[in-house]
């Protein structure tokens, strides 16, 4: 009984306010196409498509972008982000696209806030 009471009391510890995760909103644009982005499906099976934590080397799948936006929950840290995908634009065009802006340790991005927003500029692949 004493053990159960101590578990209950310890389980009610007040939140320290220190969240180890960040909710990251990813917004994509494609300046070379005048139409807006409706959807981007990332090919997570490719070696070049990743969200990678530089400290732990853990990789996360990149979600599908709806109306140019996707959200992912990541442990706070430093990340490399790169991906190839298929974009559908508001005028019906379909194109292969790439984001490689944070594809190396030298160009990585630091995500330390509880909420982060990244604006990613896509390149159309030929």
Which residues does each predicted region cover?
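Sec-dependent signal peptide recognition
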Residues: 1-3
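Bacterial Sec-dependent N-terminal signal peptides
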Residues: 6-30
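Structured interaction patches on ligand/partner-binding surfaces of diverse proteins
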Residues: 14, 86-126
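Solvent-exposed loop and beta-edge segments used for protein-protein assembly and interaction
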Residues: 18-20, 73-77, 112-114
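Intrinsic-disorder/low-complexity, polar/charged segments enriched in Ser/Thr/Lys/Arg/Asp/Glu/Gln
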Residues: 23-25, 67-69, 78, 104-106, ...
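Generic short beta-strand segments
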Residues: 27-31, 82-88
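Structural motif
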Residues: 27-42
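Tryptophan-paired
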Residues: 44-80
């Amino acid at each position: 009984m004493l053990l159960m009471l101590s578990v209950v009391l310890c389980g009610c510890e007040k939140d320290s306010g220190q969240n180890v995760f960040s909710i990251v909103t990813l917004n994509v644009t494609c300046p070379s196409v005048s139409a807006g982005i409706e959807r981007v499906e990332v090919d997570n099976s490719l070696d070049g498509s990743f969200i990678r934590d530089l400290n732990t080397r853990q990789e996360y799948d990149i979600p599908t972008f709806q109306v140019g936006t996707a959200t992912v929950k990541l442990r706070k840290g430093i990340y490399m982000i790169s991906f190839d995908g298929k974009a559908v634009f508001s005028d019906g065009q379909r194109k292969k696209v790439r984001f490689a802006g944070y594809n190396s340790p030298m160009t990585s991005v630091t995500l330390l806030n509880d909420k982060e927003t990244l604006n990613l500029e896509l390149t159309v692949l030929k």
